[in-house]
Amino acid sequence: MEKAYWPNPTPENRRDRETYMPRHLILALLAALAAPAAAAQPLTVATASPPTSADPHFYNLMPNNALAAHVFDRLVHQDARQNLVPGLATRWTPLSDTTWEFTLREGVRFTDGTRFTAADVIASLARAPDVTGSPGSFAQFLRGITSVEARGDHTVVITTGSPNPLLPNDLSLVSIIPARFRNASGEAFRTGEAAIGTGPFRLVRFTPGQGATLARNPEHWAGAPPWGAVTLRVIPDDGARVAALAAGDVDVVEGVPSALRGVLERQPGVRLWSTASNRLVFLSFDVAREVTPFATDAAGRPLATNPLRDARVRRAVSLAVDREALAERLMGGGARPAGGVLPPGFFGVSDALRPDRQDLGAARALLAEAGLPTGFRLTLHGSNNRFPDDEKVLQAVAGMLTRAGIASRAEPMPYSVLVSQGGPPVYAYSAMLFSFGANTGEASSPLRSLVATVDRAAGLGAGNRGRYSNLGFDALLQHAMTTVEPEARRALLERAGELAVRDAAIVPLLFLVSLWATRDGLAYEPRADEWTLAQFVTPRP
């Protein structure tokens, strides 16, 4: 039986820190960790963040997408390194610069027994960008599609208004549902009535804010997963998740804090799985307003001119930050310094990009050159529950900027508040610490979301909370995204990434290292996209 699985990423709320598990109690529980799990047993996975909906098209949010990937398939899947692999389409072929043919997998059935056909693809691609009330649409992945045509039950031809060589990458984010649920409500998915997929599991129960219960799909085209039942249990607090593993309450834990890595490595009955992820931690700046509210003089009055609009000031910020200290000392190896929007080795990332090394003298010189020889005051807003050590990183960066002459104050808050106030239509802040996971596994994903000029209709600038705009960058990115020849597209993306860093459109700081823990007897292939998927947890001797 062919084995080919999938996943994908995007923003999500993380830990709320309402629960605290003392380190000594975690150690005591680890000492009593039970024997290896067997495949015949159900599997319980502790996740960090709750999915908000069981509707796979409602919100392009990581917890939602991860839940969907258990129940639904996509035309194209991604492997652990985000390479494209066959999903419900066995192959995809460009017929011209603007036309793609997707050959669909035959013999596939939804978990209610109905056949999967081209009609389901047409309905899904029509529904995904147009779900009422969606706080984060999938429209960016379906931009430019002008028609989707069935040629028999097992062939789909997709036409775009301009060349889109990234269409297969984009379609790896869009779940396929039965055509009859084209107009189904979110409630119909919550109850399970419409949550019918072709994926390795079927949805038994979904409880918003708490998780989901799944049952194995024994007829899955890639072979039945090893677990008869799966519980996805949301435990927001890092320590509480690890303690649940130690107590034998769960079998798999995501988002293990780096501070506990050494402890866990010495514990019998626990296995760790880690990889450098593509999740970028970065600083974003308000460059749209002439006066910005949180850049002030010594008396706290907003400056007459927004200093963050000057690229020299943004470059000074970059030179003020000691990325090595953040990654190694503060996060204990839980991150790696970032010099671009994706780690080296991903498609479209320039080898010329290197993380800035801290140079306080050069930072002060740039501030003086920008007419700010005595610096200014700045408030940094960021999350305190989005990724491990996020509040510590925020506080540390504020301290580093202060040493360079930008007297900075950290203002941590829940991620939900940061997102609601730091983006459209409010744009309340001046400088923000955010993170971003590259959905498509290549450089256009962060560039079109974080750096491109905001254009909702075109699906560009969805994460551009500073409203940076550079028409030269936009033209270069658009050229890259419509260039069919891969090496030419790679070169254009590299140039676009270099331009974004040179102009300090954002300031890349860190790439997170993702860490999972399992009970002995289980294996998990760590993924660059950070997804935790039960179908990839396997028994091992």
Give the residues covered by each predicted segment:
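Bacterial N-terminal signal peptides that target proteins for export
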Residues: 16-26
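Surface-exposed binding/hinge segments that line
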Residues: 22, 93, 101-103, 137-182
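N-terminal signal peptide c-region/cleavage motif recognized by signal peptidases
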Residues: 34-35
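Boundary of Sec targeting at the N-terminus
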Residues: 40-41
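N-terminal lobe/hinge region of extracytoplasmic solute-binding protein
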Residues: 46-96, 126, 130, 194-198
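Extracytoplasmic/periplasmic ligand-capture domains
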Residues: 77-80, 93, 105-135, 148, ...
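Long beta-strand-rich cores associated with HINT superfamily self-processing modules
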Residues: 366, 516-541
